[in-house]
Amino acid sequence: MMPQSGVAQPPMAPMSMDQHQYQQQAPPPTQQQQWMMPPQQPQQPQFQPQSQPAWAQQPSQQQYGAMATTNPNPSPTGNPNEVRSLWIGDLQYWMDENYLSTCFYHTGELVSAKVIRNKQTGQSEGYGFLEFRSHAAAETILQTYNGTLMPNVEQNFRMNWASLGAGERRDDSAEHTIFVGDLAADVTDYILQETFKSVYSSVRGAKVVTDRITGRSKGYGFVKFADESEQLRAMTEMNGVLCSTRPMRIGPAANKKPVGTPQKATYQNPQATQGESDPNNTTIFVGGLDPTVAEEHLRQVFSPYGELVHVKIVAGKRCGFVQFGTRASAEQALSSLNGTQLGGQSIRLSWGRSPSSKQTDQTQWGGSGGAYYGYGQGYEAYGYAPPAQDPNMYYGNYPGYANYQQPQQ
């Protein structure tokens, strides 16, 4: 008899029609066999294993609804004050409550699933919450599923406690992250992670940035390390190394500082909204520059992200501009470098003025530059939820952070 406690393992895949017919047509036991066999209780149909378990197959919309109604949610048990909810992120636009229910249906521990949606558009914000029967069940689910492959999609579960209570420990240590560009279309989180983990033991995870609507890779991602020395080694040792079919392009990325590190306030660049909405804009404003940083140093830092058209530091203003050849390159640089340290100062990035703007660009490239002393909010290149709704996880909008300093050459 199977034990009732704990989390159930994923169910076996349904048997084929031929197998089902074979079992139905099997001859009944002889009279002697009937006497020797103990009385049996009604049993659930026995499933035969196959290469892909049933929980890893994409259900249809009808199956989603049927699954949700045929498995009544169990009632919570234990202390009502204990933490029983998990946060789940990196959800694609089509991943709704029914999809999440199918992921954990077989455990018998899921009470409810909720996807957070934009109040104006109704579209998913890319994260949600899962409530389980008990704290113990939620903890087992977290330990079992976090970082493993999600059903029928090439990405891993990204989970954490929805809130921290007694007994939970959060990772307050710093994380050291690198940017990885020029990724082939078939590179997944797992492939990227294993490419680095086979060389560096401190690799904590990897994330390939995907389009929220299509789910397709944008061709770049991030790898995080626990050991800063391995991060710095990877910056040079892995540059040009093949991942799948293409050589990787490695660059610096903003790091997560330990919890408790004071974060700087953010200000809104009045030009950022206009620049972000213009698909032809490839110019990035760079604020907070150390006076010792020269244009050549700025070029070295931004060049790993794509072809540079123009680099300009406004004299005496501690700010500058970097123009890329393509919008995609500018997006990668902005999302990766915002908050990194150059010359001992954390740079602040936002979109510069669009070249198509009818306004004069004298202040942008050679004038006072006064309009650009502010800088925009964290650029949500990944489509993740804001940091306040993402409890101590990595990637996306982690603000501040940055211990990597590009070496002078």
Curated annotation (Swiss-Prot):
<dbReference type="GO" id="GO:0005829">
    <property type="term" value="C:cytosol"/>
</dbReference>
<dbReference type="GO" id="GO:0005634">
    <property type="term" value="C:nucleus"/>
</dbReference>
<keyword id="KW-0507">mRNA processing</keyword>
<keyword id="KW-0539">Nucleus</keyword>
<dbReference type="InterPro" id="IPR012677">
    <property type="entry name" value="Nucleotide-bd_a/b_plait_sf"/>
</dbReference>
<comment type="similarity">
    <text>Belongs to the polyadenylate-binding RBP45 family.</text>
</comment>
<keyword id="KW-0694">RNA-binding</keyword>
<keyword id="KW-0677">Repeat</keyword>
<feature type="domain" description="RRM 1">
    <location>
        <begin position="84"/>
        <end position="164"/>
    </location>
</feature>
<feature type="compositionally biased region" description="Polar residues">
    <location>
        <begin position="263"/>
        <end position="280"/>
    </location>
</feature>
<dbReference type="InterPro" id="IPR050825">
    <property type="entry name" value="RBM42_RBP45_47-like"/>
</dbReference>
<comment type="subunit">
    <text>Interacts with the poly(A) tail of mRNA in nucleus.</text>
</comment>
<feature type="domain" description="RRM 3">
    <location>
        <begin position="282"/>
        <end position="354"/>
    </location>
</feature>
<protein>
    <recommendedName>
        <fullName>Polyadenylate-binding protein RBP45</fullName>
    </recommendedName>
</protein>
<dbReference type="GO" id="GO:0008143">
    <property type="term" value="F:poly(A) binding"/>
</dbReference>
<dbReference type="Pfam" id="PF00076">
    <property type="entry name" value="RRM_1"/>
</dbReference>
<feature type="domain" description="RRM 2">
    <location>
        <begin position="176"/>
        <end position="255"/>
    </location>
</feature>
<dbReference type="GO" id="GO:0006397">
    <property type="term" value="P:mRNA processing"/>
</dbReference>
<feature type="region of interest" description="Disordered">
    <location>
        <begin position="1"/>
        <end position="83"/>
    </location>
</feature>
<dbReference type="InterPro" id="IPR000504">
    <property type="entry name" value="RRM_dom"/>
</dbReference>
<feature type="compositionally biased region" description="Low complexity">
    <location>
        <begin position="19"/>
        <end position="81"/>
    </location>
</feature>
<dbReference type="GO" id="GO:0003729">
    <property type="term" value="F:mRNA binding"/>
</dbReference>
<comment type="function">
    <text>Heterogeneous nuclear ribonucleoprotein (hnRNP)-protein binding the poly(A) tail of mRNA and probably involved in some steps of pre-mRNA maturation.</text>
</comment>
<dbReference type="InterPro" id="IPR035979">
    <property type="entry name" value="RBD_domain_sf"/>
</dbReference>
<feature type="region of interest" description="Disordered">
    <location>
        <begin position="251"/>
        <end position="280"/>
    </location>
</feature>
